[in-house]
A protein has these predicted regions:
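Structured catalytic core of nucleotide-sugar glycosyltransferases
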Residues: 1-130
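Alpha-helical structural elements of signaling/regulatory helical domains
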Residues: 13, 17, 34, 173-177, ...
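Conserved amphipathic alpha-helical interaction elements at protein-protein interfaces in regulatory
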Residues: 27, 31, 56, 60, ...
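Acceptor/aglycone-binding surface of glycosyltransferases and processive sugar-polymer synthases
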Residues: 63, 67-71, 75-85, 90, ...
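Hydrophobic helical membrane-anchoring modules
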Residues: 1, 180-269
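A ubiquitous structural signal for well-ordered alpha-helices
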Residues: 21-24, 28, 53, 108, ...
């Protein structure tokens, strides 16, 4: 009996890219005739015709099913929902924009079935085509995470990966509301093989991540997987408490010690 590979594809306004992605994926599935496939498309409250495209695709391919959100909940929610609907012995997460080479799925399957890995993941080693400011802050984020967190977040790590069932079940047991999957992938442990590649630009459409959404996502990751912000906030709180305590003492001393002003004058003279 063949292994079942589930592929989770979160989508937000990907009506242009999705047909091209499915066309490429069909070719990969044809090459991997030694495995069975299930594709879970997740419509994350898209405002274009993504849902209509999903329905049309699912009608012609019985191994494809789709889930549609009532509104845009974000990519993290899309990935989590897709994982809950995935029935496979192995589960992959892929983007529809083809920025992650789907052909890596073949090597990933080899890694998790024959090389003893629990997960095989893609890692981008260049950021060619990205705005310089975005690349700069991305590098800074990974440096900060490396210093502030005990959980490994690999520089350039992508969501594109293939995981065995125990890896997926461990992720599903983490029921955080605000999820940061890049940190959770490392936090659950297990053995991961990294496949490096150079940046590939999206096949169609525009990125849904602007500077501020990425900045917010980075802050959420740092707060979720590092105690440093909490320690810093606690230190600042204690410092201000100490300053306030000293100020109160100096305010009350003249009332508690009537000769205190003359003592200060004598000390000054």
């Amino acid at each position: 009996m063949n292994d079942l590979i589930s592929i989770v594809v979160p989508c937000y306004n990907e009506s242009e890219a999705l047909p091209k992605f499915i066309e490429v994926l069909d070719g990969i599935i044809a090459k991997m005739d030694y495995a069975d496939f299930q594709v879970v498309l997740v419509n994350d409250g898209s405002r274009d015709k993504t849902l209509e495209v999903m329905k049309a695709i699912a009608q012609t391919r019985p191994y494809i099913k789709y889930v549609s959100f009532s509104r845009n909940f974000g990519k993290e929610a899309g990935m989590y929902a897709g994982l809950t609907y995935a029935d496979g012995d192995y589960v992959a997460i892929m983007d529809a924009d083809l920025q992650d080479p789907p052909e890596f799925l073949i090597d990933m399957y080899e890694a998790v079935t024959k090389e003893g890995y629990d997960c095989a993941a893609a890692r981008r080693v260049t950021r060619k085509g990205e705005p310089p400011i975005r690349s700069f802050f991305a590098r800074m984020f990974y440096k900060l995470m490396g210093r502030m967190s005990t959980t490994e977040v690999v520089d350039g790590a992508r969501d594109f990966r293939l995981m065995n069932r125990k890896f997926v079940d461990a992720l599903l047991n983490c029921r955080e509301y605000n999820r940061f999957s890049k940190g959770m992938f490392g936090w659950v442990g297990f053995k991961t093989k990294w496949i490096a590649y150079e940046n590939v630009e999206r096949v169609a459409g525009q990125t849904k991540w602007n500077f501020w959404s990425l900045f917010k996502y980075s802050i959420e990751g740092i707060v979720a997987f590092s105690t440093t912000p909490l320690v810093f906030a606690s230190f600042i709180g204690l410092l201000f408490c100490f300053i306030a305590f000293v100020a109160v003492i100096f305010y009350l001393l003249p009332y508690l010690t009537p000769s205190f002003p003359s003592i200060l004058v004598s000390a000054t003279i």
